[in-house]
Every structure is written in C-alpha cells, then in structure tokens.
Amino acid sequence: LSLHDALPILMEELMETLDAEEKLYQELIPVEQEKTRAIAGTDLEAMRRIVEKEHELVDKTQHLENVRKRIVLDIATVLGKDPDKMTLASLADALKKQPEDQRKLQMVHDRLRKTVMQLQDINQSNENLLRETMEMVEFNMNVIRSTRMSSGSSNYASDASEVYGTAPQQI
C-alpha cells in the first residue's frame, strides 16, 4: 500500500471516527440537560445516575479521541506535516486537491464544533447553577448556625430559672 493510496483509507477512518464522536457528544446533550434539572431540584439520586451515564459516555469519547489522534498522526506522516500542528482546519487546507474530502471534513468539523459548543454552554450553565446552589446551601447553613447561637444566648433571663429550670436558692 503506497502512501498515496493510504490517504483515502485514513480519511475514511477519520470521517467515521469524527462522526462517532459527534454522535456521542449529541448523546451527552440530553444527559447534561437532565443534569440541569437534577441540580435545580437538588435531586441527589438523579445526579448519581447522571454522573454514571456521563462517565460511560466520556470513556467512549476518550477512546474515540485516542483513535482520532492516531489517525491524524498517520495522516500527518503521509502528508509530511508536523503531527503536533495538524488540526482539522489545517488538514482541510492540506486537502485542497481533494475538494470532496475537504468539503466532507469541513462539514463534519462544523457539526462537531457546533455540538461541542452547545455542550460547553450547557456545562457552563450547570457549573453556574451548582455554584449558586452551593452558595445557597452555605447561606442556609450560616443562618441555621446563627439562629442556634442566638437562641442559645436568649435563654438567659434576669433570674437563672429559665436556664437551669429552677429558681436560684436564696441564702
């Protein structure tokens, strides 16, 4: 198999991998939206289930990311490019002589980028919601602590009978 013949095969593998990655990210969107509802409702059991599902999808995505990196390394080698500088955009530029591959890659790249940006927006909202929820919990804890402290000191009366439950003995 010549280097020239390897490029179409590698491009096909890359396209399949990018499509699979994009589908996994699409699967994450409703999971993250469910997470938003669980955070807002402080539903800890739902959060546990969601985090398990997230981990499962992230593990699959991580695997595909590793496959994609290997394919991009192979493509960079075939094209004589620096693998560390090879991005999907630079690969699309390198494919000027193959406009069909260039167009397909650009379409997949755009879909993937749009999906990832949507996930980032949802994750940012979830992060903000979590921070607000934690601040509210901390505020409530402080109110409870201050209420307990102030109610403990208000038990004292002019005679100590309220504190000790008996009137002081007179001597």
Question: What is the meaning of each model-derived region?
Answer:
Residues L1, I75-A76, F139:
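Generic hydrophobic, helix-prone segments enriched in Leu/Val/Ile
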Residues L3, A40-G41, Q124:
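Alpha-helical architecture
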